C-alpha cells in the first residue's frame, strides 16, 4: 500500500481577517455563498490575499493544485487496484481522507463546491458510502495513525535519488508538500528518510505522479 500525505496544503476557507473585505464580499454575493463558507482561491482573490497576507500572497489560496493532484491520484491504476490511500493535511491542521472510490469532479468549480460542502459538513457521502471526511489533526498525529513500514519526506534539500531507488513494494508513506512555494509549516524533523527527485522545481501533482507510477512498477501493476 502506498500512502500519499499532502502536507500543509494551501486549502482553507476565507480567513476571518479577510471576511469583511469588499471584494471578497462581492464575490460571495455573486456566488450566493456565505463568506465564511467559501474556499480561499487566489485565482479570484489574489489582490485581497496580498493585502492581508503580503508575505504569503504567492502561497496561500491554492486549491487548484490540490484539484490537479487528486484528479491524477484518484484515476490512477494504483487507486483502481485499491493500493493507494491519499490524505490532504491543511495548513490549519485539518485532515481530509479521500476514499479510493471517490472520483473528482471534472469541473474545477464543482470541485470547489464539493470541498466547500466538506468544510461545512465534515463528511461527504453518496448512497451511504463515505467519499470524503475531515477531522482535526496535526501532521505528526496523522502519520502516527497510519500503519506503514517506512516514512519518506520529499524535499528539495533531501538526498538526490531516483524514485526507483527508494520506492519498494513495502507499505510506504510519502509526504509531499501541498504548496507552490516555501517550506513546510508543520514539524517534519522526525522524518529521517528525505529525498529530492529532480534538481529543478516540480509541481506537486507531477511529484505525486512520479511516486504513484514508480510504486505501480514496484508492485508489478505496470
From Swiss-Prot:
Molecular function terms in GO for this entry? Answer: rRNA (pseudouridine) methyltransferase activity; rRNA binding
Q: Which UniProt keywords apply?
A: Methyltransferase, Ribosome biogenesis, RNA-binding, rRNA processing, rRNA-binding, S-adenosyl-L-methionine, Transferase
Q: Where is this site: Stabilizes Arg-62?
A: 64
Q: Which Pfam families match?
A: EMG1 (PF03587)
Question: Where exactly is the site Interaction with substrate rRNA?
Answer: 62, 103, 106, 110
Q: What class of enzyme is it?
A: transferase
Family in the record: Belongs to the NEP1 family.
HAMAP family, sorted: NEP1
Q: What is this protein called?
A: Ribosomal RNA small subunit methyltransferase Nep1
- Source organism of the structure: Thermoplasma acidophilum (strain ATCC 25905 / DSM 1728 / JCM 9062 / NBRC 15155 / AMRC-C165)
Amino acid at each position: 500500500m502506498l500512502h500519499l500525505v499532502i502536507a500543509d496544503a494551501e486549502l482553507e476557507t476565507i480567513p476571518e481577517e479577510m471576511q469583511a473585505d469588499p471584494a471578497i464580499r462581492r464575490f460571495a454575493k455573486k456566488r450566493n455563498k456565505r463568506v465564511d463558507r467559501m474556499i480561499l482561491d487566489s485565482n479570484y482573490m489574489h489582490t485581497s490575499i496580498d493585502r492581508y497576507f503580503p508575505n504569503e500572497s504567492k502561497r496561500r489560496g491554492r486549491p487548484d493544485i490540490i484539484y490537479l493532484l487528486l484528479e491524477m491520484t484518484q484515476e490512477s491504476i494504483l487507486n483502481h487496484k485499491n493500493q493507494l490511500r491519499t490524505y490532504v493535511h491543511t495548513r490549519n491542521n485539518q485532515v481530509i481522507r479521500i476514499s479510493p472510490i471517490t472520483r473528482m469532479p471534472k469541473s474545477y468549480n464543482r470541485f470547489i463546491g464539493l470541498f466547500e460542502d466538506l468544510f461545512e459538513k465534515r463528511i461527504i457521502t453518496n448512497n451511504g458510502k463515505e467519499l470524503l471526511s475531515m477531522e482535526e489533526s496535526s501532521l505528526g498525529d496523522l502519520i502516527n495513525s497510519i500503519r506503514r513500514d517506512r516514512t519518506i519526506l520529499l524535499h528539495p534539500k533531501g538526498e538526490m535519488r531516483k524514485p526507483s531507488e527508494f520506492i519498494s513494494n513495502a507499505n510506504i508513506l510519502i509526504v509531499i508538500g501541498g504548496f507552490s512555494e516555501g517550506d513546510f509549516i508543520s514539524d517534519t524533523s522526525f522524518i529521517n528518510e528525505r529525498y529530492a527527485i529532480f534538481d529543478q522545481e516540480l509541481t506537486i501533482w507531477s511529484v505525486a505522479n512520479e511516486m504513484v507510477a514508480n510504486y505501480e512498477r514496484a508492485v508489478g501493476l505496470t
